[in-house]
Structures are given as C-alpha cells and as structure tokens.
Amino acid sequence: MIDTVTLPPSMPELHAIVAMASNRVIGRDGKLPWHLPEDLKFFKRTTLGHPILMGRNTYESIGRPLPGRKNVVLSSTMPATEGLDVIRDVTEVAQVCQGAEKVFVIGGARLFADLLPLCSQLYLTWIDEPYEGDVLLPPFEHLFEQIDTLSSGEGYEFRLYRRKV
C-alpha cells in the first residue's frame, strides 16, 4: 500500500476510471472480457486531454500510448519508452503531470488496490452481468459513495462515485 503522507502537495487530484462486471471482474487474459463500444467512447470522452496513469501490464494490454493524453506508466521494471513517461514511484506523478488538474488512474488491479484510497472520484462502468476473468477490482464501496448515474444503456450504467469524507 502507498503511504499517503509521502505524496507531494503539488500532486494533481487522482480520479479512477474502470469498467467492472457484476462479479467484480475487470480483465481476462490481458483484455476486457466484454465488447462494449459505449464504454470505450465513455472512457475516451472522460479521459481525453488529461494524463492517464497505468501499470505496466495495463500498458502492455493496450499496446501503445493513447492519443490526446499524457501516458504515464508506473513500473519498477519497464524501460524508458518513446511516447510514455515511465515512473518508478507514484510521487513522480506530481513532476511528470505538473500543471494538470487531475490524473486518471486506469488500471490495473494492483494500481487500483494501491491508489483507490487516494482517488477523489471513481468513474465506474457497471456491467450488469458476471463475466469470467482473472483480474478483479478490489473492494471500493467502503471508500466511495455513488453520487450520480451519468447515463445507462441495456445491461450497463456509467456511475460516478465520490470518496467518502
């Protein structure tokens, strides 16, 4: 777990964004276990123009830097890569994202486990059925309260959560 005391005061606000099936699954074999174009559009619309922070496995599953966003990868083993800011410690986010109002944490599970307690908001695509998978979203309900359902469609909702005070 990351110690909140070590975060610099200049740290941008952290927001998390993730899609989760009803059984907490968020991934399978390095991919999303569902095909939901509306979720991909929501992700793009929400994160465009903002830095995104991810772990190495998440970056490797995407396979390339996402356009229109500063891509930051937190990894102790990944070498410097063109088009990315590779950092070794979460406190480096303040430096590489200097001037950013917020940074979106986009995964994976280990990064969510470490950083959800530090996030002020969570954008969750709730998928109203279980999926088989090998990556689960850690429990967050004790940290956040739902404040809005931004929109919904058949079998899914885009929910906004705020960290409990």
Question: What are the roles of these predicted feature ranges?
Answer:
Residues 14-51, 56-165:
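Flexible, gly/pro- and Lys/Arg-enriched active-site loops
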Residues 1-13, 164-165:
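Short, low-complexity, intrinsically disordered N-terminal peptides in bacterial proteins
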